[in-house]
From Swiss-Prot:
One of its GO terms (molecular function) is lipid binding. It comes from the Eukaryota. One of its GO terms (biological process) is proton transmembrane transport. It comes from Wickerhamomyces pijperi. Mitochondrial membrane ATP synthase (F(1)F(0) ATP synthase or Complex V) produces ATP from ADP in the presence of a proton gradient across the membrane which is generated by electron transport complexes of the respiratory chain. F-type ATPases consist of two structural domains, F(1) - containing the extramembraneous catalytic core and F(0) - containing the membrane proton channel, linked together by a central stalk and a peripheral stalk. During catalysis, ATP synthesis in the catalytic domain of F(1) is coupled via a rotary mechanism of the central stalk subunits to proton translocation. Keywords: CF(0), Hydrogen ion transport, Ion transport, Lipid-binding, Membrane, Mitochondrion, Transmembrane, Transport. Belongs to the ATPase C chain family. It is found in: Mitochondrion membrane. This is ATP synthase subunit 9, mitochondrial. GO terms for cellular component: mitochondrial membrane; proton-transporting ATP synthase complex.
Amino acid sequence: MQLVLAAKYIGAAIATIGLIGADDKTSNM
């Protein structure tokens, strides 16, 4: 149960960070 919530939360956070800091952090991967 916690894994699903964590995965969803982390996924949203990564998506937001990716959208916001796309230009700043191009070498994220």
